[in-house]
Amino acid sequence: MFEVVIGLEVHTQLNTKTKIFCSCSTSFGDEANTHVCPTCLALPGALPVLNKEAVKKAISFGTAINAKINKKSVFNRKNYFYPDLPKAYQISQFEIPIVEGGELIIDVNGEKKRIGITRAHLEEDAGKNIHESDHSLVDLNRAGTPLLEIVSEPDLRSSDEAVAYLKKLHSILRFLNISDANMQEGSFRCDANVSIRPKGDSKLYTRVEIKNLNSFKFIQKAIDYEVERQSAAWEDGKYDEEVYQETRLFDTTNLVTRSMRGKEDSAEYRYFPDPDLLPVLVDKAMYDEAIKIPELADEKVVRYQKEFGVKEDDALNLVSTIEMSRYFEDLVNSKISPKLCVTWLLVELNGRLKNGVTIETSPINSAKMIEFLKRIEDGTISGKAGKEVLDYLMEHPSEDVDAVIEKLGLKQVSDDSAIVAIIDQILAANADKVAEYKAGKDKMFGFFVGQVMKEGKGAFNPAKVNELLKSRLA
């Protein structure tokens, strides 16, 4: 039996407006090579100037993971040649990163586990190569976008743990508002270092790096395949022959990893301090500002339970994304019953979001949902009618809630005289059952409620029906 050893390197783009060493925009998806300047293009004489906001965002992250913040850190040149790297070196941090140490607590199947973080350092992103059938193009819009590289300890022991760690990290970055962490756009990318060893052995064996994984699903499948490949090689006596230090890519069509190149050691990058950049000195004012971080998901889970009486499972779902959390807080801050908010948000509205639509892109925004929930809470419509109204609003979100209720004829009748007339009619037609009820057969009350609601075609306010029925049977 083997034990799996996994360490993860995550590159997340920081959501600064400009690049890390120049004033070019970091906007995504624009025409190729329109956000470039002499610094991005590595023209002779162009000098880098550090973006202060990137430093502050790195400090905020370090604070969130209980890390050591180095008040003095240094930028280095990481030397390698690639077409999307105009300088033939990347400006990164090596010996003294801005963030050292730290931890994340993950939860897998109800069991909590501490995952150590080695470091988080600032660096610049490379450009993007676009390969056609007979030629390649280079887009340097991305070159120089600020990256925070977050390196975990090799503490992960399964693909499930790896995904749990990445989801926790993703949540922290989003709740801190330091990165949009959009995996589809490449602003949250993961390299997985995977090795195996016999159970009980503490030695670290040959690690294989799987590069540029950009979905939780593929990260899990890539790790599982690589573990299976290495295990089979060991059992066949071919471990030394087939498993060596290399970089592999994940084939998302065939769900296998494929060899890309030999994995470099740090010495091969010939790191040395960048002579164009002074050491980064974090003064007290910058530090004090950067460590003021917002409430994170774990803290919100605790608060939702204490303040609003939300169940733990529901609280976890409410913080599954920052957009869901904001939506919920908009609802409860409008003084609507938290229980009502949870039910209609997690079950009813969320259940209607399909085909890639999320709470962020929901046709019904929080303001419209507040109007709608107030009509349920004040008894204007019943819960059953509310589902019809919500269905209609999903298709016609711009329409007024009250106008929709009137149009669909779903407004509850709360007029005492109209309800009493029906109650008296039902009681007169069921004199024998009235006698049974008065003789102590309490369950007959439910029969009367059902008959009245049926006669009222669902338009009667159930609470009012109960109140008036009790008085007429007294």
UniProtKB/Swiss-Prot annotation:
Record field: catalytic activity: L-glutamyl-tRNA(Gln) + L-glutamine + ATP + H2O = L-glutaminyl-tRNA(Gln) + L-glutamate + ADP + phosphate + H(+); L-aspartyl-tRNA(Asn) + L-glutamine + ATP + H2O = L-asparaginyl-tRNA(Asn) + L-glutamate + ADP + phosphate + 2 H(+)
Top class in the EC scheme: ligase
Keyword ATP-binding: yes
BP-aspect Gene Ontology terms: glutaminyl-tRNAGln biosynthesis via transamidation; translation
Molecular functions per Gene Ontology: asparaginyl-tRNA synthase (glutamine-hydrolyzing) activity; ATP binding; glutaminyl-tRNA synthase (glutamine-hydrolyzing) activity
Domain of life: Bacteria
The keyword ATP-binding belongs to this UniProt entry's keyword annotation: yes
Keyword terms: ATP-binding, Ligase, Nucleotide-binding, Protein biosynthesis
InterPro entries given in the database record: Asn/Gln-tRNA_amidoTrfase_suB/E, Asn/Gln-tRNA_Trfase_suB/E_cat, Asn/Gln_amidotransferase, Asn/Gln_tRNA_amidoTrase-B-like, GatB, GatB_C_1, GatB_Yqey_C_2, Gln-tRNA_amidoTrfase_suB_CS
Enzyme Commission numbers on file: 6.3.5.-
Similarity comment: Belongs to the GatB/GatE family. GatB subfamily.
NCBIfam families named in the record: gatB (TIGR00133), PRK05477.1-2 (NF004012), PRK05477.1-4 (NF004014)
Known function: Allows the formation of correctly charged Asn-tRNA(Asn) or Gln-tRNA(Gln) through the transamidation of misacylated Asp-tRNA(Asn) or Glu-tRNA(Gln) in organisms which lack either or both of asparaginyl-tRNA or glutaminyl-tRNA synthetases. The reaction takes place in the presence of glutamine and ATP through an activated phospho-Asp-tRNA(Asn) or phospho-Glu-tRNA(Gln).
Complex formation: Heterotrimer of A, B and C subunits.
Protein name per UniProt: Aspartyl/glutamyl-tRNA(Asn/Gln) amidotransferase subunit B
Taxonomic source organism: Campylobacter curvus (strain 525.92)
